[in-house]
């Protein structure tokens, strides 16, 4: 069985798709005004804002009350036939981004038995960054009694040959179009097509072949190859996994092979899609002795012929060569050094997206900045396979408004 499968997808039958679709709950956590606008915009209409708990509300006194209300609203939407069921289907999605490019994806479900978020996992589906396990229990409280799930998870495949999703895109005119509208709050256009029957079967066959050949792609690496990586929403998928494991623990010996909790709805995307841009995240260390830090880095983590990165101290800058033997990625070498150094020496690290902002911050007294290169797309899977996990803040996949909006759903009870 493939690790990514067609699902009985719940598709909303509502008058306003614009009011229905809401951005991922882990965005705009420090901007309550954003969520207030969303609630006001969707007031009185069926909307996913009534089915999710914005992350900003986790751990607040209102959490339990809001969670109970969410579950009641989910049950109400099901009872009132808000959804049309798309049996044994995928949904092909095209999302316009800020720069005008179109990101392609395929909504389906993953087998949680094929996913393990722990560091050093050898499962077919893995996390790209370290999972903060303390963040899972609050999310389990939201999911545990929910009758349906709505995904904001973006899962990635390393399909350089573009054999999985792209053939669906080429034949989309033969598919039933489900939606075409503008997402609220500047999310731009989104379109979706139903992929079922022969089109779904053809995708399943291509995925079977793709999975069988994954080992050849990474034959030069010591680690066990993987099929998919979780790009966005890993803590959401980890929550689904934890709820499933909890169910298994409470029902020893029960056959849960076809239980809805074994699966989770996600959107699969190809890292080699032209719209996928991996932006680097730079490092600045303040409240430190910058020259001492730089000297320690040269002594402990540098080697000739390594990854070249540029450092900035005040108005001075230069290049250093990081030891390739320590990681598949330059950021892996640097972050490993910084983690160890800051345990024994003074300094505070921050993660900066903009080049100019990093240089300006490094001009402060007692500061040093490191400008990192953008990660090549082919390095993502190789980095996880070889190193077990990517360093935190390795790369950024798009801006906040480009994250997935809640749209499709699936029964989990």
Predicted regions located by residue number:
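Surface-exposed, charge/polar-rich loops and edge strands
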Residues: 1-413
